[in-house]
Amino acid sequence: MNELILNLKGDVSVPVEMDKILPEKIQEMSLEEISGIELIQGNKTAKVSEIFDVELKESDVAKVTINNCCKKVKRIGEKMTSGEIVVNGDAGMYIGVEMKGGKITVNGDAESWVGQNLKGGEIIINGNAENYVGSAYRGDWRGMSGGKITITGNAGSELGEYLKGGTIVIKGNTKIMPGIHQNGGMIIIEGDIEGRAGGEMMKGAIVVYGKILEPLPSFKFEGIVEDPLVKLSKKDAGTQLKGTFIKFSGDYVNTKPKGQLYAAIENNKNLI
């Protein structure tokens, strides 16, 4: 196995698209071949070696490491199927888009559309992420369907838009409308939500440990539950939560919704 190490040479003023650099694709390539790969940069192309200092070494796993990265470096890990990508620094838009397997770790912040249409694998952002984490493409109604996304900091608006499956975990706070149009999967938010969680939600579950600042009136109070086992389907083994929660169902702007919303009672007594 090989590890490709890319060290960004300097400031990038025009966005660079990294979708051609995947762990599984570079295993049979030489250093010279990798250095000569043409990357889209704005309305032109540039060779990998023009933007990065390139190293190649043996590794236990197929791996790509990007050092000194910035938010102008986009589409990292797009359609990745296996291996590992480590980003030291910030990452641009569309990281892990349509990813099916493997693992991406960003040691920094990420721009919008982290894990758009994610199908499998794992993405960890050790920082903040902007809008549309785990969302669908514009105009599509099929969002993330598998895998796991973890944001250790805060996230922006409309995370989990049209979520169908998989898990999104936010360790910090989120802006408005997490789980909008959600149709499966689970969103766990350990911090506060600015409001409107689960708008037009049909299926799936949202768990909020912090405070829901602007709850939607179209959710139905189902009771107080202790250490609930959250099941997303009849065959699902379930996810065991610890603590006391206020349970709601919704969103009743839809017909016969099966969405579940759990709010930790210690931070949401005003919702009872």
From Swiss-Prot:
Domain of life of the native organism: Archaea
UniProt keyword Oxidoreductase, yes or no: yes
Region (7 X 13 AA repeats of [GW]-X-X-[MLP]-X-X-G-X-[IL]-X-[IV]-X-G): 77-210
GO molecular function annotation: formylmethanofuran dehydrogenase activity; transition metal ion binding
Enzyme Commission number(s) from the entry: 1.2.7.12
Pfam families: GXGXG (PF01493)
Catalysed conversion reaction: N-formylmethanofuran + 2 oxidized [2Fe-2S]-[ferredoxin] + H2O = methanofuran + 2 reduced [2Fe-2S]-[ferredoxin] + CO2 + H(+)
Paired cysteines (S-S): none
Per-repeat ranges for Sequence: 77-89, 96-108, 115-127, 141-153, 160-172, 179-191, 198-210
Pathway: One-carbon metabolism; methanogenesis from CO(2); 5,10-methenyl-5,6,7,8-tetrahydromethanopterin from CO(2): step 1/3
Enzyme kind, highest EC tier: oxidoreductase
Biological process terms in GO annotation: methanogenesis, from carbon dioxide
InterPro entries in the cross-refs: FMH_DH_FwdC (IPR054942), Formylmethanofuran_DH_suC (IPR017550), Glu_synth_asu_C (IPR002489), Glu_synth_asu_C_sf (IPR036485)
UniProt keyword list: Methanogenesis, Oxidoreductase, Repeat
Family: Belongs to the FwdC/FmdC family.
Subunit annotation: This enzyme is composed of seven subunits fwdA (65 kDa), fwdB (53 kDa), fwdC (31 kDa), fwdD (15 kDa), fwdE, fwdF and fwdG.
The protein's role, per its UniProt record: Catalyzes the reversible oxidation of CO(2) and methanofuran (MFR) to N-formylmethanofuran (CHO-MFR). This enzyme is oxygen-labile.
Protein name as it appears in the record: Tungsten-containing formylmethanofuran dehydrogenase 2 subunit C
Gene that specifies this protein: fwdC
